Amino acid sequence: MIACLRLLTAFCLAALLAACASSPSSTLGELPRTPDASIEQLLEKAATAKPEEAALLRLSAADQAARQGDSARAGQILGTVPVDTLKPAQQIFAVTLSAELALTRNDAKAALAALNHPSMSHLAELPVEQQVRTSTVKAKALEADGQTLAAARERIFIAPLLNGAEATTNQEAIWNLVMALPPEQLQATSNDDLGGWLSLALAAKTPGTLQQQQAAIDNWIAQHPNHPAARQLPQQLVTLKNLKNQPLDKIALLLPQQGPLVSVARALREGFMAAQFQAQQSGQKAPAIEIYDSSRITNIDDFYRQAQAAGVQLVVGPLEKNLVKQLSVKAQLPLPTLALNYSDSAQAGPPQLYQFGLAAEDEAHEVARRARADGLHNAAAMVPKGEWGDRVLAAFRQDWEGGGGRIMAVERVDQPVALANQIAEMFQLRGAGNTTGATPTRRQDIDFIFLAATPQLAQQIKPTLNYQYAGEVPVYATSHVYSASGDQAQYNDMAGIRFCETPWLLDTGNALRQQVTKQWPAAAGSLGRLYAMGADAYLLAPRLDQLKALPDNRIQGLSGSLGMSSTQRIERQLPWAQFDGGQVKRLPDTAR
């Protein structure tokens, strides 16, 4: 009876091993796969199996745990497998699984290190399924590590191995990767599939009217008839080609003509109308502009009925936050609307609503991008007390910590008299005791300071940093530190501070800016940001559908480089400058 049981056990083990392996070749070894047995059954059998058989069983058990979402257990089981003693097929399986587990921990570098294994030279000899699995995780790891072009190249490599839904998913991933590349990396140097993808992305990113962009895509297809993307366009381009090229003939400009926002509305209106005048001067067919007074609105639905009856195709405005909130909670709007403010909700509003403003949150994100591009890791933050400072800090924290950075200290500033103590606390400044001539010590783990403050406060902060032995710590600020007043004494007090700012205030040679400041001198100062926003609202008006169809597209405006989020909010990326010798010195743009 015992002999029979042993024989039965042997047969079961053989069947289980057969279910756990496929055999590419005798030299490569058997490739594990997940059988119908449970993890516990696989591990139980592995405990009494021969070493090679046990390794197959444990690899299958680890793979099954990973597929069930138990990454910790998968890693624990995988750790019991002696990878160096395995045959190449099993090694590739093991390092692929190890890379997948590393990505669940958001550790792209560990994933790439795992895949940098000698056995990978045999990958092309394995079944297609394993080639696809290994190359897919490598592409994901490269993308997570910021190696966007290499990730696209890896996905292009496996594209011929795929079909059906997998092929479509991979093709959309390739498109998203090449569209994330900066323009200088889109210059195709070959006629292979990668070169075709790069030139298609360049065509899609080249600014122009809807008609021009559609023609650029058609020209690309004619030049690359056998390219995979010509046979099946990415979904974004399908949407773009299906947009109706309908001219925009009439815009309603909805702004308050009385109340506390009159001066803001005036600057927006003058910037908007100046942009229309410039378009007419350059020979463009400009839409008619009809101005409506939002301060007189008692019923927003009545306004839309009036606008529709007047033949309006697009509403630009309102500016008032309460009216934007009303629009944001509606299911539909009668007309496409570019609001000149943001609702408080982060959720998308009705499909016809777009929101645009000079959000301080955009600038907080810009500081995070810049500091990250400059290779910095640990931040301290100085923001004003109150709701505005809390919002700016929250936006910076979300972006900075989301990208792997750390915030070591936060100070909420208010009164200049308290700055010395606040900065001393932030840097944990310690006195030199009784040692004559010794320099006080401070913490050394702060790479830079994120600053959101008025010019008057900022010009107190930088000298105080110098006094508190922290003058060499870089300061990255929002535009709020810049008064654009030309006050050299103030600029000297802020020497070394880097800040993001609108092109309007930094590029003083811009033709539209020169026209506007000649007529309205106040536009040369801090109020110029609103003139820039008004001009950009005109620029955005005919291109909203394009930005919606191609979220990676950007419009180079005077308030920043403009793109659209998934919630149809216009987001700005800004150029940079630095206070230097009582002047404002333009810095190179942030690498994107």
Functional labels for PLM-detected ranges:
Residues K518-R586:
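Segments of small-molecule ligand-sensing domains
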